[in-house]
Regions:
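Long, charge-rich, low-complexity intrinsically disordered regions
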Residues: 2-9, 86-88
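Amphipathic, hydrophobic secondary-structure cores in small proteins
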Residues: 20-78, 82
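Short, Lys/Arg-enriched anionic-surface-contact patches
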Residues: 6-19
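Short acidic/polar alpha-helix capping motifs at helix-coil junctions
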Residues: 1-4, 76-78
Length: 88
């Protein structure tokens, strides 16, 4: 995420943790295990707790206003996972 985008997010009314989560999610991970290790190291959260916070965050309008493309992508991914689960 660029410095300009990060400054826009910080001025959006989100908490520092929420800004860090959005910034973290803007990265791409090749392996799921690497991402989960980074979650523990950077946020001192378990992966399930991190994803609970993320799911709550991407439903909020201030997150959408701060990082619309990222939030839309995360919402699409979540919806696809939910549809795949319900199709089983």
């Amino acid at each position: 995420m660029s410095a300009v985008e990060n400054n826009e997010i910080q001025s959006s009314g989100l908490t520092d943790l929420e800004v860090r989560i959005l910034d973290f999610e803007s990265n791409w991970w090749r392996f799921a295990g690497a991402k989960e290790s980074a979650i523990k190291e950077l946020f001192d959260l378990t992966a399930p707790r991190y994803y609970q916070l993320l799911n709550d965050l991407i439903d909020r309008e201030d997150a959408m206003a701060a990082a619309p493309m990222l939030v839309k992508r995360l919402r699409r991914l979540r919806e696809a996972r939910m549809q795949a689960r319900s199709a089983r």
